[in-house]
UniProtKB/Swiss-Prot annotation:
<dbReference type="GO" id="GO:0007463">
    <property type="term" value="P:R2/R5 cell fate commitment"/>
</dbReference>
<dbReference type="InterPro" id="IPR046327">
    <property type="entry name" value="HXA1/B1/D1"/>
</dbReference>
<keyword id="KW-0217">Developmental protein</keyword>
<keyword id="KW-0805">Transcription regulation</keyword>
<dbReference type="GO" id="GO:0048054">
    <property type="term" value="P:R2/R5 cell differentiation"/>
</dbReference>
<dbReference type="GO" id="GO:0000978">
    <property type="term" value="F:RNA polymerase II cis-regulatory region sequence-specific DNA binding"/>
</dbReference>
<feature type="region of interest" description="Disordered">
    <location>
        <begin position="1"/>
        <end position="23"/>
    </location>
</feature>
<dbReference type="GO" id="GO:0007601">
    <property type="term" value="P:visual perception"/>
</dbReference>
<feature type="region of interest" description="Disordered">
    <location>
        <begin position="111"/>
        <end position="137"/>
    </location>
</feature>
<keyword id="KW-0238">DNA-binding</keyword>
<protein>
    <recommendedName>
        <fullName>Homeobox protein rough</fullName>
    </recommendedName>
</protein>
<feature type="compositionally biased region" description="Basic residues">
    <location>
        <begin position="123"/>
        <end position="132"/>
    </location>
</feature>
<dbReference type="InterPro" id="IPR001356">
    <property type="entry name" value="HD"/>
</dbReference>
<keyword id="KW-0844">Vision</keyword>
<dbReference type="GO" id="GO:0000977">
    <property type="term" value="F:RNA polymerase II transcription regulatory region sequence-specific DNA binding"/>
</dbReference>
<feature type="region of interest" description="Disordered">
    <location>
        <begin position="324"/>
        <end position="350"/>
    </location>
</feature>
<dbReference type="InterPro" id="IPR017970">
    <property type="entry name" value="Homeobox_CS"/>
</dbReference>
Length: 350
């Protein structure tokens, strides 16, 4: 195995670079000792994690390389044995060289095994000085996702490239969306429970039992199941649904009564406002007292002037009229009884 030793001296008299290269790419080690000024934290992290980043070119190819960002130029130019090739834009550090040997991992812990072009594999077995520094970036041979994903189907929804271009690349979003798709597939594959259809006879019998008692006992439930050819669970669920329906109907009726009361109160307030403007200064003559709730208002109007419809104020007026008529009838009856007592004379028995 032939080994080459290269000593590079800097023009300012600083220590040179001792480099030992071999033709074997596995045994090839690069040892550089270049005095550099302290780097910033951003440049430090670029050296550590620069090989994990991907960059898409304009033609749709993905460039994956050990140098995602250009490091600061080195003071000492790079010379090779094969020719005078110098590039001040390329600087190799120990951290970048050591980390480039490890494969890249995605956020799921899977190693990214990128296929390489045969020409690139052939280039890796040659020495570095046979190629210019522009071959640092490796272009992947495959650009688009697998055919199943390109056709619109998600062959593996866990991978980030399976999502459309509009979705964010957040790992938490990808994991949550994958779980959502899994739950949806399980739900679609599961057979839905058939809804029980009750006949007219069964419904009438159950309605009769519900009107007798809203909560059915276990013994009675067993008897109904035998009679109607149903299961006890079906009867139990029917009673639960019927009670819920009753509560909904009752709540709707209460809401309707409340709305009617609000409408009637607003209508009577408008009538009282009109009556206050037309009321004579001496007071109310010939008016009637109209009650709304517990408050009574004097209105300069007759009952015939108010609308006789299904509103609540009309019902109050009807109740007041009936009460007055009953009072008048009682007074007339009392007067008739007194007259009868006065006309009748006692019979003297001798």
């Amino acid at each position: 195995m032939q080994r080459h030793k290269v000593e590079i001296g800097s023009p300012d008299g600083s220590p040179g670079i001792k480099r030992s290269d071999s033709l074997d790419p596995i045994a090839n080690t690069t040892i550089l000792s270049v005095p550099q000024r302290p780097s910033s934290p951003r440049q430090f992290f670029e050296r550590l994690y620069g090989h994990l980043e991907t960059r898409s070119s304009e033609n749709g190819e993905i460039d994956v390389g050990t140098h995602a960002h250009k490091p600061p130029p080195c003071d000492t130019p790079y010379h090779s044995d094969g020719g005078s090739v110098s590039s001040p834009d390329i600087s190799i550090s120990d951290e970048r060289t050591s980390l480039a040997a490890y494969p890249a991992y995605d956020f799921y812990g899977h190693a990214k095994d990128y296929p390489q072009h045969p020409s690139q594999q052939h280039q890796q077995h040659h020495h570095h000085h046979h190629h210019p520094p522009q071959l640092v970036h490796q272009k992947l041979s495959y650009v688009s996702p697998p055919p199943a994903i390109a056709a619109g189907g998600a062959a593996n929804p866990v991978l980030p490239h399976a999502f459309p271009a509009g979705f964010p690349s957040d790992p938490h979003f990808s994991a949550g969306f994958s779980a959502f798709l899994a739950r949806r597939r399980r739900k679609e594959g599961r057979q839905r429970r058939q809804r029980t259809t009750f006949s007219t006879e069964q419904t009438l019998r159950l309605e009769v039992e519900f009107h007798r008692n809203e909560y059915i006992s276990r013994s009675r439930r067993f008897e109904l199941a035998e009679t109607l050819r149903l299961t006890e669970t079906q009867i139990k669920i029917w009673f639960q649904n019927r009670r819920a329906k009753d509560k909904r109907i009752e709540k709707a009726q209460i809401d309707q009564h409340y709305r009617n009361f609000v409408v009637a109160n607003g209508f009577m307030s408008s009538i009282m406002g009109q009556a206050a403007t037309t009321m004579p200064p001496g007071g109310v003559t010939g008016g009637v007292a109209v009650g709304v709730g517990l408050n009574y208002y004097a209105a300069a109007a007759t009952p015939a002037a108010l609308p006789k419809d299904n509103t609540q104020d009309a019902n109050f007026i009807d109740i007041d009229d009936q009460f007055q008529r009953q009072q008048q009838q009682k007074q007339q009856q009392q007067q008739q009884q007194q007259r009868r007592r006065e006309t009748t004379t006692p019979i003297n028995i001798c």
